[in-house]
Amino acid sequence: VTHAIPGAAMSYTISTTVDLPYDRAVEATRAALADQGFGVLTEIDLAATLKAKVDADIAPHVILGACRPQLAEQAVAREASIGLLLPCNVVVRADGEQRTLVEAIDPEMLVSVTENAELSEIARDARTRLDAALAALPARLH
């Protein structure tokens, strides 16, 4: 059992930086997620949305809503309201011309808010798969 240090922020992300231009990193991220059984259910172009709604300019930035249906079904069977926390968001954002940051929400941290211990194993599985997807990104540089 781990305990948070008072005053310390709990990490809620899994992240990596890749030496790929943004568009190629988005493509590689989609493929890496698919290799781990995740489908992308939603896609929000945050840069375009902020430009259209509040005329703000930010670097290219997309939010992919990733879901592994088998895990979602197991989670819903154990916690009817879990849909409020689905899908797992994966963010791809430009960090210059040739570097891109890829971040995913940590499913284990996310389900901790439910205080439902039955979700821990499901969240751990999702975390392992997201870790593997992000770890595979450097291999997609070629």
Q: Model-predicted segments: where are they?
A:
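Short glycine-enriched loop/turn motifs at secondary-structure junctions
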Residues: 10-12, 34, 56-59, 95
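Terminal, regulation- and interaction-focused segments at domain boundaries
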Residues: 7-36, 135, 139
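Short glycine-/small-residue-rich flexible loop motifs, especially phosphate/cofactor-binding loops
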Residues: 30, 47-48, 131
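Beta-strand/loop substructures that line and gate deep hydrophobic ligand-binding cavities in soluble
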Residues: 89-116
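Conserved active-site and cofactor/substrate-binding residues in soluble primary-metabolism enzymes
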Residues: 20, 24, 45, 125
